[in-house]
Amino acid sequence: MTSFRPFSSLDLLKYNLVNTDCLTETYGLSFYLSYLAHWPEYFVASETIDGALSGYIMGKSEGEGRLFHGHVTAVTVAPPFRRQNIANKLMEKLERVTEEFHDAYFVDLFVRASNENAIRMYEKMGYGPYRRVIGYYGNNALDDGGEDALDMRKAMRRDTKKRSVIKAKKFEQKPWEIEWH
């Protein structure tokens, strides 16, 4: 059985078993603490009945006007707990915070273009590709060898006309061409 609760700073001592695959981004401690301090409502942990961390989601709200949105910075589930809808439930919690607490227009996320399993999961949840970011997962913004990302979006209730999910006029963009906010 899995339960969900707010992520705490002590979870940073346990998350190594969750961040084990090459598709999961692992950030520095200060990055996680910054998110926990600024957007605690967007940081949720899943745990087993014996208290082991099985997954987490972290995100934030950003943008202004019609670009005000929730952003999924990371969602990951430890390999033994995958295919149990934990990631879906974590995503639903982030979407609920985005709608009920922030009243934002949409939720967005970036996913490796090669991560077909994650892309299918997001599509089943109502996310669609907004644009492709060329070389997003490189060592730096000027690295031509980086892997592409799909910027996927899902409109929230506030976006009654679904304008936020209409594909970008220029679908393929370099990281420095993106209007972030």
Please place each PLM-identified region on the residue numbering.
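Conserved GNAT acetyl-CoA-binding A-motif
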Residues: 98-110, 121
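Short glycine/proline-centered loop/turn elements that form peptide/ligand docking sites
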Residues: 91, 115-118, 135-141
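Acetyl-CoA-dependent GNAT
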Residues: 2, 9-82, 91-102, 155-163, ...
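Loop/turn elements at beta-strand to alpha-helix junctions within RNA-recognition modules
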Residues: 78, 112-115
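Conserved G/P- and acidic residue-centered "switch" motifs that form tight phosphate/ATP-binding loops
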Residues: 85
